[in-house]
Amino acid sequence: MSIMGLLSSEQLNQLKLVLDTLSKNQLIWLSGYLLGLVNSQTSTDIGVTASGVSAGLELKPDLIDNTIIVISASQTGNARNIAKQLYSDLVEAGLRAVLFSAGEYKFKKISEISLLIFITSTHGEGEPPEEALALYKYLFSEKALRMEKTSFIVLSLGDRSYEYFAKAGKDFDKRFEDLGANRLYDRVDLDVDFQSEVDKWKEKVVSLCKSKIVSIVSKDKCINIQNNIVFKKKNPVTSYCKEFPLIAYLLNRQKITSCNSLKDVHHLEFDISGSGLCYQPGDALGIWYENDYNLVYELLELLNLTGRESVQIKNQSMCLDEALVKYCDLTQNTPVVVKSIATISQDKILLNLLQNQNQLNSFCSTTPIVEMFYQISMTKQLSSQELIQILRPMRPRFYSIASAQSEVGEEIHITVSVVRYTINGRIRSGGASSYLVDRVQDHDEIRIFVESNDNFRLPKDPNVSIIMIGAGTGIAPFRSFMQQRALDKALGKNWLFFGNLKFTDDFLYQIEWKTYFKSGILNKIDTAWSRDQDYKVYVQDKLLSNGLELWDWIQKGAYIYVCGDAKYMARDVEQALVTVVSIHGNMNMDQSNDFWNEMRVQHRYQRDIY
């Protein structure tokens, strides 16, 4: 749609008269002001992405050469936020730039880009973020086109605590080069505490881009680009984020597994009254938790520290115990932590572990930090500041939102499975899950923010059918989906596949699902209970046994949604889906994999995995 199709001639003339009087900085300010107005109107038919440009944007061929394409591949929002910052800096520098998420960009056209800046995080065991999977598979296929005309820059985010640090970015970087693209700047790999390094990187990138693209955008060129923008509806956003969370309050917490269950799962409701916080089905809730004081003082005693020592964190002085409660990850051990402690302590157990990566990884996954100090001898006193520098910075935990805002109003719901296990007779718990279930009380304050997930959205057309596949707490977003579909009076059919341990103990939200089924809103439900018989039954088995009908739904346009564990459940479910299409769609396995990749591109196959 062109501007002429949106504004009358009189409106366009009045707008041009005003714009001609504005400086570049005034235009930049105005663009942000107008974006805010658009985002505050939920009923508008026109909107833009958070970057200020539209999704699905295609530039005319004569504009591509002098346009910087910024693509972000994000799992929890970090890469996307950096891309937005860079985009703003490029525009402020007078450069023509367009921002996309990896899921928005028509990846087969990537070889036509003149200047590409690619910013990605790493997910799981070195995989790219979910929204970048289709692009990743295309680039590493024989179908990928050469990229000789493309100059590129890659920024890769990761966590040095893990074996596959920044691997997704490294993979993209090497593949761009293998396809003939020209490196404009060496890849930069950043750890979890990245902001200061990001600022330096952005400054360098803007300088390089200004040198690469001599022509600075004029007002006329700005108008030409706007003529190519396709506007789309966008829901409102708020200013709450990881750095500036909302203070919410716990309204209700209810255990939703039986007392006999091997799992301890709870439904939590938070009060967000008056905050203006908005969310959609499919979004995630970020929660800043606090460590257990008992765990903190157990660790301090093992290290002969009092907790009253002064330490520096984020340029602030505070007592060590406060820093450990609020700013350090005490529950997840990592190879980097073990290596640091081994170097200082010279403990033989840890030094031997460093010689075998597999044994080191196994030790980290089974031995929490505090348990490690029970097992080793410290030949040197660890200082309070050394401890702070060794431990990973605390990061928020993310939970799939289990409510539709149009149903629950100024509340937000999540589903939490508490991590509990015993080591050497001592009970250990997960940091965030035990905080939410064991330590937070009704009406206590919780620091939260919404992480938008445009890669896990209901179909825009309510007449389209959906298939929901979840295991354990992976059922949470489907509760929000069904609340929304019921309110929308969606005519599309709904089919739920759900798996857990036992029917009598672990059927999460059972009454709600039965109510939806009896009312006809939920058309089909297939459950898999892995411990209810001598042999294991999982959701992927149910997919295979319902393969013919599943294929029929897919052929009729159904959207497929998967939520659950990334390492096992999501992998096995995808293999089952590939098998179903191969058998009932009369395809070989390669063709079936291509089919699901195309389903991803069409946003008909979406996953929320963790």
UniProtKB/Swiss-Prot annotation:
**What molecular function terms (GO) are annotated for this protein?**
flavin adenine dinucleotide binding; FMN binding; sulfite reductase (NADPH) activity
The family database entries (Gene3D superfamilies) matched by this protein are listed as: 3.40.50.360, NADPH-cytochrome p450 Reductase, Chain A, domain 3, Nucleotide-binding domain of ferredoxin-NADP reductase (FNR) module, Translation factors
Q: Where FMN is bound, by residue?
A: 74-79, 121-124, 157-166
Q: Where is the FAD-binding FR-type domain?
A: 243-459
PROSITE patterns according to UniProt: FAD_FR, FLAVODOXIN_LIKE
Catalytically driven reaction(s):
hydrogen sulfide + 3 NADP(+) + 3 H2O = sulfite + 3 NADPH + 4 H(+)
Task: List required co-factors.
Answer: FAD; FMN
Q: Give each disulfide bond as a residue pair.
A: none
The free-text cofactor remark is: Binds 1 FAD per subunit.
UniProt binding sites for FAD: 331, 365, 397-400, 415-417, 421, 430-433, 610
What EC designation does it have? 1.8.1.2
Q: Could you tell me which pathway this protein works in? A: Sulfur metabolism; hydrogen sulfide biosynthesis; hydrogen sulfide from sulfite (NADPH route): step 1/1
- Could you say which residues bind NADP(+) here? 530-531, 536-540, 572
Single GO cellular component term: cytosol
Q: Which UniProt keywords apply?
A: Amino-acid biosynthesis, Cysteine biosynthesis, Electron transport, FAD, Flavoprotein, FMN, NADP, Oxidoreductase, Transport
Q: Which residues form the Flavodoxin-like domain?
A: 68-206
Q: Which InterPro entries match?
A: CysJ, CysJ-like_FAD-binding, CysJ_Proteobact, FAD-bd_FR_type, Flavdoxin-like, Flavodoxin/NO_synth, Flavoprot_Pyr_Nucl_cyt_Rdtase, Flavoprotein-like_sf
Q: Which GO terms describe its biological process?
A: cysteine biosynthetic process; hydrogen sulfide biosynthetic process; sulfate assimilation
NCBIfam families cross-referenced by the UniProt entry: cysJ
Similarity comment: family membership: Belongs to the NADPH-dependent sulphite reductase flavoprotein subunit CysJ family.
**What function does the entry list?**
Component of the sulfite reductase complex that catalyzes the 6-electron reduction of sulfite to sulfide. This is one of several activities required for the biosynthesis of L-cysteine from sulfate. The flavoprotein component catalyzes the electron flow from NADPH -> FAD -> FMN to the hemoprotein component.
Known partners and oligomeric status: Alpha(8)-beta(8). The alpha component is a flavoprotein, the beta component is a hemoprotein.
Q: Which HAMAP family match?
A: CysJ
User: By what name is this protein known?
Assistant: Sulfite reductase [NADPH] flavoprotein alpha-component
Q: What species is this protein from?
A: Blochmanniella floridana
